[in-house]
Design a protein with these regions (language model features):
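Structured, mid-chain assembly/scaffold modules that mediate subunit interfaces
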Residues: 70-227
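N-terminal-proximal low-complexity accessory segments that begin disordered
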Residues: 1-96, 497
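Surface-exposed loop-to-helix/strand elements on domain peripheries
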Residues: 101-104, 108, 304-423
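Extended, charged amphipathic alpha-helical segments
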Residues: 222-359, 403-404, 486-487
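C-terminal anchoring/interaction modules
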Residues: 2-16, 350, 360-361, 379-498
Length: 498
C-alpha cells in the first residue's frame, strides 16, 4: 500500500478498500504484459482473422516485393541458393521396390530416360531435376507452384509436366464447376475445404490474357506449398517475414557505398590573388585579366603545372572515419538466416569463425530445416512417379501382370538423395565406422546417408573382390583394411588359401 493509500485508509477505510480492490481487479485482468496497451505497446494493434482473410490482401504485394528482391538482392539469392543446394542438390535417384529385380531395373532405366527435358517437360526445356530446383525457388519466393499432369503424345511415355505460376490462378472466377462447391482464389473447394479443381487463366504467346479460364481437376494437378494454419487456402511467400530486413540491409549497403565513393574523391581549389602588373604569355594559359586560367584542368599522375603568382592550391579530401559495416551486416545476415531456419554460415558462406565442431553442429541443424522441404518435394515426386507408372502400363511400355490388383506393390519405391561431401573425411569416416561397429547405425543407414543402395553396394564390392581374384590381386585389404589376406601378404606372411 502506497503512502497516499495509507492516508486515505486513516480517513476513510472504505475508500481505501475500494481503491485496493479495483487495483487488484485491474492486475487480474491484465494477465499478460504482451496484451497490455501501455506506452510501449500503444501502437501495436493486431486482430485475429482466418488465414485466408489475413493473407488475401497482402499476398500479391508480398510476392511482388519478394520477386523484386529475387532479381536485385544478393542476400535473398543467398537464402534461395542455400535451399536449392541442399534440398535438391545434384538430384534424387529412384529405387524401384517391386520385388522383381529385372522389373526394377527396367523401371529405373525408363525413369532415367523420362527425366530428360524432351520427355518430362511439355516445353522440352527443363529436365526433371531442373524442374525440382525451380520448384524450390518458386516456393521460397512465391510461396508455391502448381504442376499440371499432361498426357500428351511424344516422349518415352504419354505423360509430361506443365509448371504453372500461382499468378495464373484466376482469382476473378466465382462460379464453381460442380454445384455445391465454392471457388476461392482460383481454387474450387468442396464442403470439407478439400481442393477439387483449379481455374487457370489463359494467355496467348505474347502474354495477353484471354477471357475464359480453363478448369483442371485436382487429380490432374499438384499444388506444391506449405500449409501453416488449418484455415489457410492459398500459398504465402516463405520470405514474407524476412524481406523487410533484407531490403533494409540493401539500403544500408547502398548508403555505405555512396559514402565510401564520396570519401574516395579528391578535389583541388585554387585560391587566387590579383597580380600587381600585366603578365605576358599565351592567352591559352592566362585569361583577359592576366591571371592563370585553371578551368577544365584535372589532376593526373606525375603532372607538372605552373601556377599564377601568389596562387595557392587547397586540397579538399573528404575522408573521414571509415564505416565498419562488417559487424552490422554479420548480425543482419544471421537474423535473416535464422528467420529462414538456417545458420549464419549457410547464408553468408563465411566460415572464418567456425571450427569443425560448430560447422558440423550447424550443418546438422540446417539439415533438419531442409528436411521439411525435402519431405514436401519427395511427396510431389512420388505423385509424379505413380502417374509415370500408370502411363507406362496404359501405354504398354512395361507389362505389369494384375496391375490394378497389385498397384501398391508395383508403385513401391524409394528416393535416394545425392550425398554431400564430408567436411573432414577422416573424422566422419571414423565416426561411421564406430557407429556401425557399436550397433548405433546399420549398414543400410550408412549406405543411405552416402546416397547408395546397400544391396548395390554389396554387389559392387563382391564384383571387385571376384575380379581381383581372377587377376591374382587380393583386394580385401584395400577395401576392408588391416587383418585381411592382403594385409598379411604385404607383411610377408602367406594369405589363406581359398
Amino acid at each position: 500500500m502506497s503512502f497516499i493509500d495509507s492516508m486515505i485508509a486513516a480517513v476513510s477505510p472504505k475508500k481505501a478498500y475500494e481503491r485496493e480492490a479495483w487495483r487488484q481487479g485491474l492486475e487480474a485482468m491484465r494477465g499478460y504484459d504482451a496484451a497490455g496497451f501501455g506506452r510501449i505497446n500503444s501502437g501495436w494493434r493486431a486482430h485475429n482473422e482466418s488465414a485466408e482473410i489475413t493473407d488475401r490482401y497482402s499476398r500479391d504485394v508480398v510476392r511482388a516485393r519478394a520477386r523484386d528482391l529475387e532479381r536485385n538482392s544478393d542476400i535473398l539469392q543467398a537464402v534461395v541458393l542455400a535451399y536449392k543446394r541442399n534440398v535438391v542438390g545434384k538430384g534424387f535417384t529412384l529405387r524401384a521396390r517391386t520385388g522383381d529385380d529385372d522389373l526394377n531395373r527396367q523401371i529405373e532405366k525408363l525413369w532415367r530416360q523420362w527425366c530428360k527435358a524432351r520427355n518430362c517437360d511439355v516445353t522440352g526445356e527443363q529436365s526433371f531435376t531442373e524442374i525440382l530446383r525451380m520448384a524450390v525457388e518458386r516456393k521460397k519466393v512465391d510461396g508455391g507452384i502448381l504442376f499440371l499432369f499432361r498426357h500428351t503424345s511424344g516422349g518415352v511415355v504419354p505423360f509430361k509436366l506443365q509448371a504453372i505460376e500461382v499468378d495464373e490462378l484466376d482469382v476473378t472466377q466465382s462460379a464453381p464447376h460442380r454445384q455445391g462447391n465454392r471457388v476461392v482464389g482460383g481454387i474450387e473447394y468442396n464442403s470439407w475445404r478439400r481442393p477439387v479443381g483449379y481455374w487457370i487463366q489463359q494467355y496467348d504467346l505474347e502474354g495477353w490474357r484471354l477471357l475464359q479460364p480453363i478448369y483442371i481437376d485436382a487429380k490432374d494437378a499438384y499444388f506444391l506449398k506449405s500449409k501453416r494454419r488449418p484455415s489457410q487456402i492459398r500459398e504465402m511467400s516463405d520470405m514474407s517475414h524476412t524481406i523487410t530486413r533484407i531490403r533494409d540491409v540493401n539500403e544500408f549497403i547502398n548508403a555505405v557505398s555512396v559514402k565510401e565513393r564520396i570519401a574516395a574523391c579528391l578535389a583541388v581549389l585554387i585560391k587566387k590573388t590579383i597580380p600587381t602588373g600585366t603578365s605576358l604569355g599565351r592567352s591559352g594559359i592566362r585569361g583577359p585579366d592576366g591571371r592563370v586560367d585553371y578551368s577544365g584542368k584535372k589532376l593526373g599522375p606525375g603532372m607538372i603545372m605552373e601556377m599564377g603568382a601568389g596562387d595557392e592550391a587547397q586540397v579538399v579530401d573528404p575522408k573521414g572515419a571509415a564505416t565498419d559495416a562488417t559487424a552490422f551486416l554479420k548480425v543482419q545476415q544471421g537474423l535473416i538466416g535464422a528467420g529462414q531456419g538456417l545458420s549464419y554460415e549457410a547464408v553468408s558462406r563465411d566460415m572464418s569463425g567456425s571450427t569443425y565442431s560448430s560447422a558440423r553442429q550447424n550443418a546438422i541443424e540446417d539439415e533438419d530445416t531442409y528436411a521439411e522441404d525435402v519431405e514436401l518435394l519427395t511427396e510431389f515426386m512420388s505423385e509424379v512417379y505413380e502417374q509415370f507408372i500408370i502411363s507406362c502400363y496404359l501405354s504398354g511400355v512395361i507389362t505389369f501382370p494384375g496391375f490394378w490388383d497389385k498397384k501398391a506393390e508395383y508403385m513401391a519405391h524409394d528416393w535416394v538423395k545425392s550425398p554431400k561431401k564430408w567436411i573432414d573425411p577422416a573424422k566422419e569416416s571414423t565416426a561411421d565406422k564406430t557407429a556401425l561397429q557399436s550397433g548405433q547405425k546399420t549398414y543400410q543407414e550408412i549406405c543411405a546417408e552416402r546416397g547408395k543402395d546397400w544391396r548395390q553396394a554389396i554387389d559392387e564390392t563382391a564384383e571387385v573382390l571376384e575380379y581381383g581374384r581372377e587377376k591374382g590381386i587380393e583386394m580385401g585389404g584395400v577395401i576392408f583394411g588391416n587383418g585381411t589376406a592382403a594385409a598379411q601378404q604385404n607383411a610377408g606372411g602367406q594369405p589363406p588359401q581359398g
